[in-house]
Amino acid sequence: PLGDVHGRVVGQLRSVHARGVEGCRTMYGARGFVCHHNTDIWGDCAPQDRVVPATLWPMGGAWLCLHIIEHYRYSQDEDFIEGYFDILRDAVLFFMDTMVKDAQGYWITGPSVSPENTYRTENGETGSLCMGPTMDAQILRQLFAGYLMICKDLSANDELARQVHEHLEH
């Protein structure tokens, strides 16, 4: 069943988290954990390969954490979520430390990429790195909303939850 496979993906987050905490600190000087576009059975989280339209994507950890949120959303298993809350919280912390406000006052990620996508500038040059790709915003909206839902259920509302709420509002 799909649930069995899902459990293995969520279980893999333990090794990804351990390596991603170190990568977050050394690469970004930030709290939390980060996983880029690729990982493996050893939990490697650093950017890999030479394909710029995918390599630098820092959303892998957040995307994987959506599995934690979905599992909890449909199971309401508090033992499960208490066992993974540290990973979810660390994924959120990374973005609290690294997001910046754009000219319109919105919180955005960057530099990032929209995996395997390139854009063309007005003068015809192509690029991949950008600020605030839509895919990042969609993943973070789900991550942040899920985090707040779980904080409410666990009565774990704190300063981080307040910051997350502010980021969702702006």
Question: What are the roles of these predicted feature ranges?
Answer:
Residues 82-86:
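Aromatic- and glycine-enriched glycan-recognition loops and surfaces
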Residues 12-15, 19, 87-101, 146:
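Alpha-helical scaffold segments in carbohydrate-active enzymes
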Residues 1-36:
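Carboxylate/His-rich catalytic cores and anion/metal-binding grooves
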